[in-house]
């Protein structure tokens, strides 16, 4: 069974420690998205697509720093690509990270001692291993995780 790991990093304060893991064992949809509670705390969502895309919602009145990415456990040399979209409150596309056109790379996570496929990110490119957060206006945002057949 393959699970994707979806990171949301939203920073509204200057202190950021380790992320909070959250297991998503249902399929949050656009009408009932998974609420990102306390968005100022970095989160890692663990989920599995079972025929429908997953939706997450961030409601934040204040401007904040935003970053999101996707990882998938590396169980063999093949990966299932996944994409990310950020939509505004009217479900208009704001940002897209197309996993089908992304060069997925193997990445070792030293704390968990696990290998992952590192997928696309929505952030500011850096010279580092991962992109960084960028300023975004306060408001309501939906994050969609999907692929062609919504499995993985």
Describe the function of each predicted region.
Residues 19-30, 79, 104-105, 148-150:
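Juxtadomain low-complexity/linker regions and immediately adjacent membrane-anchoring helices
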Residues 6-10:
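Hydrophobic helical h-region of N-terminal Sec-dependent signal peptides
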């Amino acid at each position: 069974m393959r699970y994707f790991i979806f990171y949301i990093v939203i920073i509204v304060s200057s202190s950021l420690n380790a992320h909070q893991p959250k297991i998503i064992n249902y399929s949050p949809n656009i009408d009932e998205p998974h609420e990102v509670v306390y968005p100022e705390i970095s989160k890692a969502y663990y989920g599995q697509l079972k025929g429908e895309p997953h939706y997450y919602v961030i409601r934040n009145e204040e401007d904040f720093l935003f970053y999101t990415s996707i990882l998938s456990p590396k169980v063999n040399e093949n990966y299932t690509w996944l994409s990310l979209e950020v939509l505004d409150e009217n479900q208009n596309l704001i940002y897209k990270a197309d996993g089908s056109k992304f060069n997925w790379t193997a990445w070792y996570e030293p704390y968990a001692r696990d290998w992952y496929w590192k997928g696309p990110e929505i952030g500011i490119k850096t010279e580092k291993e991962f992109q960084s957060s960028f300023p975004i206006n306060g408001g309501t945002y939906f994050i969609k995780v999907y692929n062609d057949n919504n499995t993985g």
